[in-house]
Amino acid sequence: MKTIVVTDIHGCLEELESVWAQAGFDPETDKLICLGDLMDRGPYSFGVFDRFRSLKRKMGERCIMILGNHDDMMMNSFYDPVVYARWMRNQGQTTLDSFEEHHCDLEKQLRWFYEMCPYYENEDAIFVHAGLVH
């Protein structure tokens, strides 16, 4: 079993799939740790979300999802107009467009993002998107 760690996918599904192919990622046996920032910038935020959601269902505890700052900003933008404006400046519209293109209401999918961890720790390492708050 390999452990595959990815981060800052930012809606770039094709590049993510390419990295997984190069690494020989096997969702049947490997462990996957995503260090966050699934959304924004790239054109396929919905595809990235859908792929990880499917993998989490299939892999269970072998798929660790850590919250990134863009994921957090996206989640909070639905409740705070200041955060929404910041999200739009950080290419949040590309995420909204991607979800709308698939007739999927992003706000209704927020529960899945709330299940992400702030960090993951095993006997060898601590995995985090950018830093730990003390």
Label every PLM stretch briefly.
Residues 8-10, 69-70, 129:
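Histidine-centered divalent metal-coordination motifs
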Residues 21-23, 85, 125, 130:
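A sequence-composition feature that detects small, non-aromatic residues
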